[in-house]
Amino acid sequence: MAKLYFNYSTMNAGKSTLLLQASYNYIERGMQTYLLTANFDDRAGMGRIGSRIGIEAEADTYTQSDDLFAKIDARLKAGPCACVLVDEAQWMTRDQVWQLARAVDDLGVPVMCYGLRVDFRGELFPGSAALLALADEMREVRTICHCGRKATMVIRVGEDGNALAEGAQIEVGGNDRYISLCRKHFREAVGDVPV
């Protein structure tokens, strides 16, 4: 039975590496996969998913106005596809997550999403919130803070190296802009969040 999966973490935990490894495992067994990523994430090149360890693969892109059910349906009509893998899933809209759930339920294709749980302010992304509500299975991908504790938060740093508390929720960046921390060190970096 097909399921909707959400593999979540903070930055630099290896989510894209795990996605690419899962795709490779299917391909190695003679099955095709359908990779999706946001059209504005060009860190590995437009229409590519890349990992920090140097592996990458081509992917179809989507905008926040695309109907992901329609994209998956069209891909399945073009030929067999064993699995859909979505990178940077936090950037999907709530409606797009529902479209993925519909693809799982109505088209019978497993969908594996990989993304951040919270942003640099400690708030859920809309796509992540919807996935936490709708996913059949959720898996935490672990990484560590500089202190050795499990990192569950991320800060965005400015050019001066200081943590930022304001700004757009979506800003594509990598190791130079984001640092994964445990909650204690997140609070030390940005201060306590007002209740």
From Swiss-Prot:
Main localization, broad class: cytoplasm
Record key words, sorted: ATP-binding, Cytoplasm, DNA synthesis, Kinase, Metal-binding, Nucleotide-binding, Transferase, Zinc
Residues annotated as signal peptide: none
Enzyme class: transferase
InterPro entries for the chain: P-loop_NTPase (IPR027417), Thymidine_kinase (IPR001267), Thymidine_kinase_CS (IPR020633)
GO CC term, one of those recorded: cytosol
Name of the protein in question: Thymidine kinase
NCBIfam families given in the database record: PRK04296.1-5
Residues at the active site: 88 (proton acceptor)
Taxonomic classification: Bacteria, Pseudomonadati, Pseudomonadota, Alphaproteobacteria, Rhodobacterales
Catalytic activity as recorded in UniProt: thymidine + ATP = dTMP + ADP + H(+)
GO molecular function, one term: thymidine kinase activity
Binding site for Zn(2+): 145, 147, 182, 185
Family to which the UniProt record says this protein belongs: Belongs to the thymidine kinase family.
SUBUNIT field: Homotetramer.
Taxonomy, superkingdom: Bacteria
GO biological process, one term: thymidine metabolic process
Positions annotated to bind ATP: 9-16, 87-90
Cellular compartment(s): Cytoplasm
